[in-house]
Structures are given as structure tokens and as C-alpha cells.
């Protein structure tokens, strides 16, 4: 290999590594969005803490949740694509866990993925736990509410910049709380 070619290759490799090491410029915006999520709540709203666990029996969950929400959240089912009214929800506000009311996303975290399910590129910090799901043979990452353990959906690496993440959420696992307080 010629010396000039070797030097060019090394320089390009160094620059590529530096670019990978530096956080994207708009990640600061994500951090601010995550930090300031409470600004999307209606005035005077009380929200549960993720450190207050909700433990109910299967029968208690069955009584508390509508049938489809129970199937998704307690039996790790999936709602039919395109059926959730939350797909078209555009108002400012908070998306909370339908099982326990824990805020999990803001309206600013939502994006149109074209999949038929409400999709988000990031979350309110500390609200979900993840685990591998081998239901469809290949491994996927599913996420559950940290407070009540309810299944919400799956996490994919095909979302928009800067996170590249898509939290594909079942609409029946969420309830929307508009910032203006009007249902």
C-alpha cells in the first residue's frame, strides 16, 4: 500500500471515530425534552411516582382494565394496527400508562411512523423496563411500565434522528392527558 493511501485511510478512520464519539448536536434537545416533561401536564395535575409500585392480582387487573387493554398489558398481546384513536392525537399533553397513570411520553416525543401504532422516539426517563421477546422467533425488545409491569410495546432501531429509536406502543396501553385539561 502506498504511504499516501495509508495516511488518507488512517485520517478518515480517525475522523469517523471522532464523529461517532461526539453526541449529535440535537441530543441536547432530547435531554431538555426529557427533563421538562412536566410542562406538558395540565395545571395542578397530580402524577404517580415510578417508585410507588402497583401490585394487583390477575383478577383485579381484569376488573380494572377494558378487555383489550387487559389482553395487551397483562398477556403481552398486540392491538390491531390502525385502530387506536391516539394515532391521530396531535394536542399538547402527556401519554400515561393505562394501567397505573404513570406519565411515559409527552406529545413532543410522538412521531408518525406509518406503522398504525402510536410511536415515540424517546420516553420520560426511568418509566420502562425492557426484556428480550422471542415470540416471533427472532429477538425483539419489549418494554413494560416500571410501576405496574404492564406491557406497552416493542422498541425498534428504525426511528428518527437523533435517537434512531421507535417505541411502538399499543394505544390501548396508554391514556392521553391534554395539557389544557379538556378531554
Regions found by a protein language model. Give the residues of each.
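N-terminal secretory signal peptides and thylakoid transit peptides that target proteins
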Residues: 1-14
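C-terminal segment of N-terminal export signals and the immediately downstream linker at the start
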Residues: 17-64
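A short Gly-Trp-Pro
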Residues: 48, 53-56, 62-64, 69-96, ...
Amino acid at each position: 500500500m502506498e504511504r499516501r493511501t495509508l495516511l488518507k485511510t488512517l485520517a478518515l478512520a480517525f475522523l469517523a471515530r471522532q464523529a461517532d464519539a461526539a453526541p449529535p448536536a440535537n441530543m441536547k434537545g432530547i435531554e431538555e425534552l426529557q427533563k421538562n416533561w412536566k410542562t406538558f401536564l395540565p395545571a395542578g395535575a397530580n402524577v404517580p411516582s415510578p417508585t410507588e409500585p402497583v401490585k394487583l392480582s390477575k383478577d383485579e387487573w381484569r376488573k380494572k382494565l377494558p378487555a383489550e387493554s387487559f389482553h395487551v398489558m397483562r398477556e403481552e398481546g398486540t392491538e390491531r394496527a390502525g385502530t387506536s384513536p391516539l394515532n391521530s392525537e396531535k394536542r399538547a399533553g402527556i401519554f400515561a400508562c393505562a394501567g397505573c397513570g404513570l406519565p411515559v411520553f409527552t406529545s413532543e416525543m410522538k412521531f408518525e411512523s406509518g406503522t398504525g401504532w402510536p410511536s415515540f422516539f424517546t420516553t420520560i426517563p426511568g418509566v420502562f423496563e425492557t426484556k428480550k421477546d422471542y415470540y416471533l422467533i427472532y429477538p425483539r425488545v419489549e418494554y413494560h411500565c416500571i410501576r405496574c409491569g404492564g406491557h406497552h410495546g416493542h422498541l425498534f432501531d428504525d426511528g428518527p434522528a437523533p435517537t434512531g429509536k421507535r417505541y411502538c406502543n399499543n394505544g390501548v396501553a396508554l391514556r392521553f392527558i391534554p395539557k389544557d385539561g379538556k378531554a
